[in-house]
């Protein structure tokens, strides 16, 4: 890839497949930002994934739980942990790769105006049958203690409203330009220029 910065919209991607792609790109030196992690898909029903996550919550260090397994609840941190598991994060190379990654719920201000990409090989529609049960990472996080889901949804609604007004304005400008170019006053000038090969 090797762009200055790659912004990936994680909506509709599968958790593990997207994490493996991101990990590989990070190791090659690419800087990556992943947005909308609350909309990542996990194969399997919400109930099944909650059972698996509750088993993970049971893991801790007996004599000092604060030093043991960190049980992240936010979707961004769950995805970060999945990527970390695919990197040699205890070596300098892996630690440097992990520092090149930024992950967010929703789309915060600097990245809402940046062109975003998708990873086609990691999309749910490419990899799973329609009949397969899936759940969203945001729903799983909210069911195990993440308390920011409603806030993120409100902020996303506001962002979508801003994006719609911006898009409508651009469409209106494009239509006005088309009308100007099709005006009869310009037709005579265009015909004159066409004689000279323009």
UniProtKB/Swiss-Prot annotation:
GO terms for molecular function: mRNA binding; structural constituent of ribosome. Keywords: Ribonucleoprotein, Ribosomal protein. GO terms for biological process: negative regulation of translation; translation. One of its GO terms (cellular component) is cytosolic large ribosomal subunit. The gene is RPL13A. Belongs to the universal ribosomal protein uL13 family. The keyword Ribosomal protein applies. This is Large ribosomal subunit protein uL13. InterPro entries: Ribosomal_uL13 (IPR005822), Ribosomal_uL13_CS (IPR023563), Ribosomal_uL13_euk/arc (IPR005755), Ribosomal_uL13_sf (IPR036899). It comes from Tetrahymena thermophila (strain SB210). PROSITE patterns: RIBOSOMAL_L13.
């Amino acid at each position: 890839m090797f762009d200055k910065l790659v912004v990936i919209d994680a909506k509709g991607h599968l958790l593990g497949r997207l994490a493996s792609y991101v990990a590989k790109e990070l190791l090659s030196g690419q800087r990556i930002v992943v947005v909308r992690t609350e909309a990542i898909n996990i194969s399997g029903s919400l109930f099944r994934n909650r059972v698996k996550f509750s088993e993970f919550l049971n893991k801790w260090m007996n004599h000092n739980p604060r030093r043991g397994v960190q049980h992240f609840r936010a979707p961004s941190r769950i995805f970060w942990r999945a990527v970390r598991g695919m990197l040699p994060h205890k070596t300098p190379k892996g630690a440097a790769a992990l520092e090149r990654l930024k992950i967010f719920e929703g789309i915060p201000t600097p990245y809402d105006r940046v062109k975003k990409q998708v990873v086609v090989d990691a999309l749910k529609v490419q990899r799973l049958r329609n009949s397969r049960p899936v759940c969203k990472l945001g729903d799983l996080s909210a069911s195990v203690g993440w308390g920011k889901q409603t806030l993120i949804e409100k902020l996303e609604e506001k962002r979508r409203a801003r994006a719609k007004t911006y898009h409508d304005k651009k469409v209106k400008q494009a239509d006005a330009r088309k009308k100007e170019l099709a005006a009869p006053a310009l037709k005579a000038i265009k015909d004159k220029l066409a004689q000279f090969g323009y």
